[in-house]
C-alpha cells in the first residue's frame, strides 16, 4: 500500500468531522461524553466468540455519530488467531496498535504492526489480521460506522462457538463478506 494514499485518506477524514454537524452526520451534537479507560460506552465489555476470544469496548458508537463513524478499543487475548480474510462493502477501517504485535494483510500486501503503528484498510479490499503477541490492544476506527458494532454484539450474544458457516452468515448479515481463511503468521 502506498504511504501517500494512507496519509491522504486519513487526513480526508478530518474535514468530514468539521462539517459533520452541517451535513447532519452527528447524532448527538449538543453533548459531549467521556469514556473511562478500560470501559465501553455501550454494551459493557463485548466478549467475542468464533473468530477470536478478544474483548471490545465501544468508545464511540455509530449511534453517537448518526452513523458517521464508530471507534472501538480491542483487548486482544487470542495469540495466533485473527479474522478470516474478509471485506467491508461500505466501510474503511483504521487500526492503531496500543500494545502488542499483529500481522495484517491488505489486498496482497502483508505488514507487521507493533506499538504505535497504524494501518488503513480501504473498503472493498480483502483484509485480515492475526495477533502475534501473547496479548495486545488496538484502537479500531470504522468510517462510516456501518453494522460492525452489531456484528460484535451478535457474536458475543451466542451461547456457543459458531461454526465457520454460521460466521459467514453473521458477516453477511452485517455488511461484510468472508473471502478466505484467517491469516497465518509467516
Identify what each model region corresponds to:
Residues 83-90, 128:
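Histidine-centered catalytic micro-motifs
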Residues 108-123:
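Short acidic-glycine-tyrosine-enriched beta hairpin
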Residues 73-77, 87-104:
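Short, conserved beta-strand element in jelly-roll/cupin
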Residues 123-149:
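Ligand-binding loop in jelly-roll beta-barrel domains
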Residues 2-26:
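N-terminal export signals
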Residues 154-186:
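Acidic/histidine-enriched, glycine/proline-rich intrinsically disordered or flexible terminal extensions
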Residues 48-85:
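A short glycine-rich, His/Asp/Glu-containing loop-to-beta-strand
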Residues 20-54, 157:
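C-terminal segment of N-terminal export signals and the immediately downstream linker at the start
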Amino acid at each position: 500500500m502506498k504511504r501517500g494514499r494512507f496519509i491522504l485518506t486519513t487526513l480526508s477524514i478530518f474535514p468530514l468531522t468539521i462539517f459533520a454537524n452541517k451535513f447532519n452526520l452527528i447524532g448527538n451534537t449538543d453533548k459531549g461524553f467521556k469514556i473511562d479507560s478500560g470501559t465501553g460506552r455501550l454494551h459493557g465489555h463485548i466478549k467475542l466468540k468464533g473468530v477470536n476470544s478478544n474483548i471490545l469496548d465501544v468508545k464511540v458508537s455509530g449511534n453517537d455519530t448518526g452513523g458517521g463513524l464508530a471507534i472501538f478499543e480491542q483487548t486482544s487475548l487470542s495469540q495466533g488467531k485473527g479474522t478470516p480474510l474478509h471485506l467491508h462493502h461500505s466501510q474503511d477501517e483504521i487500526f492503531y496498535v496500543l500494545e502488542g504485535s499483529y500481522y495484517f494483510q491488505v489486498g496482497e500486501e502483508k505488514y507487521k504492526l507493533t506499538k504505535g503503528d497504524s494501518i488503513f484498510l480501504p473498503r472493498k479490499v480483502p483484509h485480515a489480521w492475526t495477533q502475534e503477541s501473547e496479548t495486545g490492544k488496538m484502537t479500531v476506527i470504522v468510517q462510516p460506522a456501518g453494522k460492525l458494532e452489531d456484528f460484535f454484539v451478535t457474536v458475543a450474544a451466542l451461547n456457543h462457538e459458531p461454526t465457520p458457516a454460521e460466521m459467514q452468515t453473521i458477516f453477511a448479515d452485517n455488511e461484510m463478506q468472508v473471502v478466505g481463511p484467517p491469516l497465518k503468521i509467516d
